[in-house]
From Swiss-Prot:
Expressed on different subsets of axon bundles (fascicles) in insect embryos. Residues 27-155, 167-321, 329-470, 474-622 form the FAS1 domain. Keywords: Cell adhesion, Cell membrane, Glycoprotein, GPI-anchor, Lipoprotein, Membrane, Repeat, Signal. It comes from Schistocerca americana (American grasshopper). It is found in: Cell membrane. One of its GO terms (cellular component) is plasma membrane. Residues 1-24 form the signal peptide. It is a lipid-anchor; GPI-anchor. This is Fasciclin-1. SUPFAM superfamilies: FAS1 domain (SSF82153). InterPro entries: Adhesion/Biosynth-related, FAS1_dom_sf, FAS1_domain. Neural cell adhesion molecule.
Amino acid sequence: MEGPRLTALMLLLLLTLAADRASAKGEKSLEYKIRDDPDLSQFYSWLEHNEVANSTLQLRQVTVFAPTNLAFQNYKARDGDENIILYHMTNLAHSLDQLGHKVLSELDGNPPLWITRRRDTIFVNNARVLTERSNYEAVNRHGKKQVLHVVDSVLEPVWSTSGQLYNPDAFQFLNQSENLDLGLHRVRSFRQRVFQNQKQNDFKLEGKHTFFIPVDEGFKPLPRPEKIDQKVIDGHIIPNHVLFTSATPLDEEYETLAFTDMLRVVISFTMESDGKAHKPYVKSNTVIGDANHATGAVLAEIVKANIPVKNGVVHLIQRPLMVVDNTVKQFLEGFEKEDGPLYKFYQVILDAGGDFINQITEMKDLTLFAPSNAAWSETTANNLLTDRKKFREILNLHIVAEKLSIESIVEQNVKQVPTMADRKNLYFNVVHGPAGNKTVTVEGGGVNATIVQPNIAATNGMVHIINKILGVPYTTVKEKLRTDPMLNKTYHLGEMSDFNKMLDEKHTKFTYFVPRDLAWKKMEVRDPSAHRKLFMKEFTYQVKQILERHLVISDRVYTMGALKKLASNTSSVLPTMRDHLRLRVRETEKSYYVEWQGEWTHIFRPDVECTNGIIHVMDYVFMKEGDIVVGGPDGAGQQVASFAVVASAHLVVLATVRWLLH
């Protein structure tokens, strides 16, 4: 009896260990886990109706990528996709840290699933892995290890309409596109150019690559197809990277096959928004061009994204990259669709812009700073359309009569350029990011905008998409001081002395002569001791008095043009918070100058509009020699002391005179 009992005891121990192991990896089988999760009910419905998937779970090792119910709500089902569940399964069990750059699915032909790691986030094709709900491990009754990962999107393979094309590479995709389900899109024109230029092998490359294929719609007008040469075709392929839209950082540039010593073309992804929806775009940037390939960027909408193929991923795009054959006018006209990145800008030009379109058509070289769709969602922007004269002036503020790239602004240290608006300039600032990246901001009419899509090339100029409408103020005087990188010191002094608080008042009209940082630096050179005291807490009283001399509060704002009229022959007297400000104004061809206390100073940026006033940025500080004196912290002590010294001196003089007279 001892032998059977010992055998039974050993068997019980083994079963207990197996149960403990199963408990450690997952108390339920993978099938039970999926069935028991209400958020995976749609996926389980697929599973129980597919015999092959059921057999795989029962008999084999497997990794399952299960989409959530929300993912199915965003998925457009098609006839004959009942086997798509097999594209969510592999024949080996992989935890997340065991996943390589690709795994083979169980769908016919074993098309790959591409794995992307981006910091702590993992993507399968374009679907994000929900890591907190993944890595569930179990064993089936045959002892086969199985792993479940939950993803936020349904995984979609290439769909063949003929039933004979499985797991195509990019060349097979292009060459047999009529046998694939691409909706209404056709790619015959691009395929023809690939064959004519003998570039088929580019699309047969083994490994992992990203291919951009323009649809037939983008090959108009007729001269455009002839511009698709070998180098342009190379500019549609990113080697050694599989880039899905959700898994790829925006605005990060990748070298194309057209990145050589003589020609350098990079590609990046971007996202355009109208304030409601987001639309993916791809941008080619020809950094170094040649006689047949212009420098600058070309923007193309991705009309069908994230099509996985054997050697990477394909994106269908609205037009060819690298080809610059539109004028600025034609570029704007190309965004008649409501989801185009400049659709709203183009519409307001048609509605209220007068002959603005004709103006940019006649210009040979221009740069257009075009506000994005999101910029036009501001209420103040919509109110502008009622005043057509004012609106036209604002449109002119967005045009510069020369071709100006971001590189020229940065490398040539361009600070300001005149616009087509009368006596209005644009002012540039380059912000250096922590990763070495550079962001260019542009100010016009008091509005500071960021260039979000630079260097879009046209045959007669350049277009930069910006995130705000220039000339439409949306900040108070205080907020403008806080956010303007040239006015840091004046803002800091105002904060120290509590002077800035009033500048947020919405129902007051301010005219503020604001010294820029360079003006304070000049003052430091002239009087380093006084400059040092300005930034000490003990002298906030005097600082406040100095700033008060720069601020005019009235029932109106004073533009430089208005001040020029007031002081056409004599100096004008403005009621500042501290006494009066007596100024003379001189106007030159491009600038304004003001005279105060016998000193002429340049107005670096006149007429910076704010919601509650106007700012004139200048190169000088209205400061007198006796404004900063040593004394008590509130300023009263030194004034009393100074008065006592002067009075004592006068008494001594009077006493001496009387003694001499006697």
